[in-house]
Swiss-Prot record:
It comes from Bartonella quintana (strain Toulouse). GO terms for cellular component: plasma membrane. InterPro entries: T4SS_VirB10/PtlG, T4SS_VirB10/TraB/TrbI, T4SS_VirB10/TrbI. The chain crosses the membrane at residues 31-51. Residues 1-23, 123-145 are annotated as: Disordered. It is a single-pass membrane protein. It is found in: Cell inner membrane. This is Type IV secretion system protein virB10. Belongs to the TrbI/VirB10 family.
Length: 385
């Protein structure tokens, strides 16, 4: 028993000694690594100190600009003539010739220098001549006088506004003219529907007289043809109609190019307006019903149902939304039945002088007799007082 205990103690001591030896070995390795690191750092510091020493600074060499061509004296300026006196304005101007000195050599050297130059500048000869003439005409005192900005503004304020006058004129012959602004009552011959653009026509319900009320220019029964465009906007309840041409029973035609109005002169034609509420509300109800049906079907399906059936159910609301978008943008429709009354607002003076001619149907004696009795109507028993 004692021998076993002694062997155990000896084994424990040997393990303790082995652990202490390992610790000493690790400490020595750490010390060696630290010394190596310090040596590397010292070497780097020493190398940086050597490189940071002041190096001799080389000054840039000064560029010396030398003259490659000979010096040329400036050409003499042309002598300007002194302004003549007021009494000698009619005398012709005499230009003195300027002396020319070796112009050929100077021109050749300038031409060679211009060809060697990287950039060439050109000047318009006409502008330069005009500027030279202006400079010769103006005196140095005038060049020194520059207008002040305040003076220019004041002069601009003193200028009045140019107003063009408008002259009054008269109509050539009022017996042949239907003046602008007249109203022509007309009965629709065809019905109107704003779903599609198209043409329409109407019949004049009474005789239309001239501007002075003496001559019938458009007989009763005249046919007027016009056109209208499709597509009313939401909230509108009037349709614009443009009357193009009128044709009398005798075959006289004239271009109107005038708009249609109602009895009170309001632009456009009124009528029965259909806003298509049933289609719009029906599409909204369709969407709600389809959504409820798809939700109910989705809840009724088992969780392990096939994917194709779920895709079919989910595509229902998308189709309903597309239908709603198409029906929600339906424009309102205006309809006006045939036989209803409309008016034509004359937008320009209508001249019938090229197709109608007037002639006297009573002699002077008959006219005088009717004027004495104050009966201005032919074959009438009514006496006007």
């Amino acid at each position: 028993m004692k021998d076993e205990i002694d062997e155990n103690n000896i084994n424990d001591r040997s393990t303790i000694k082995d652990g202490q030896g390992k610790k000493l070995h690790s400490n020595t390795s750490k010390a060696v690594a630290l010394l190596v690191l310090l040596g590397v750092c010292g070497y780097l510091a020493y190398s940086t100190l050597i490189t940071n020493k002041k190096q001799p600074v080389e000054l840039p060499k000064e560029a010396i600009i030398k003259q490659t061509e000979r010096f040329r004296p400036a050409q003499p300026k042309p002598v300007l003539l002194e302004p003549t006196e007021k009494n000698n304005l009619l005398l012709p101007k005499v230009e003195l010739p300027t002396p020319k000195r070796n112009q050929t050599n100077a021109d050749d050297s300038l031409l060679e220098a211009a060809q060697r130059a990287p950039v060439l500048a050109y000047a318009s000869p006409q502008k330069s001549q005009a500027n030279a003439e202006k400079n010769n005409d103006t005196s140095p005192n005038q060049l020194e006088r520059k207008p002040d900005e305040t003076a220019q503004r004041f002069n601009h304020l003193l200028k009045p506004t140019n107003l063009e006058g408008i002259h009054a004129s008269t109509l050539t012959n009022r017996n042949y003219i239907i003046a602008m602004g007249a109203s022509i009552p007309c009965i629709l011959e065809t019905a109107i529907s704003s779903d599609q653009q198209g043409f329409t026509s109407c019949i004049v319900s009474r005789d239309i007289l001239s501007d002075n009320g003496r001559v019938v220019l458009l007989d009763k029964g005249t046919q007027i043809v016009g056109e209208y465009r499709s597509g009313l906007k939401k909230g509108q309840n009037r349709l614009f109609v443009l009357w193009n041409r009128a044709k009398t029973p005798s075959g006289v035609i004239i271009t109107l190019a005038s708009p249609a109005t109602d009895a009170l002169g309001r632009s456009g034609v009124d009528g029965d307006v259909d806003n298509h509420w049933f289609e719009r509300i029906g599409s909204a109800l369709l969407v709600s019903i389809v959504r409820d049906a798809t939700n109910y079907a989705r809840n009724r399906l088992p969780k392990d149902q096939d994917k194709n059936s779920s895709d079919t159910i989910s595509s229902g609301p998308n189709i309903a939304n597309i239908v709603v978008e198409n029906y929600a943008n339906i424009p309102p429709t205006l309809t006006k039945n045939q036989g209803e009354m409309v008016n034509v607002f004359v937008a320009r003076d209508l001249d019938f002088s090229s197709v109608y001619k007037l002639k006297v149907i009573e002699d002077k004696k008959q006219i005088v007799n009717r004027s004495i009795s104050r009966n201005f109507y032919k074959n009438s028993a009514v006496i006007l007082k």
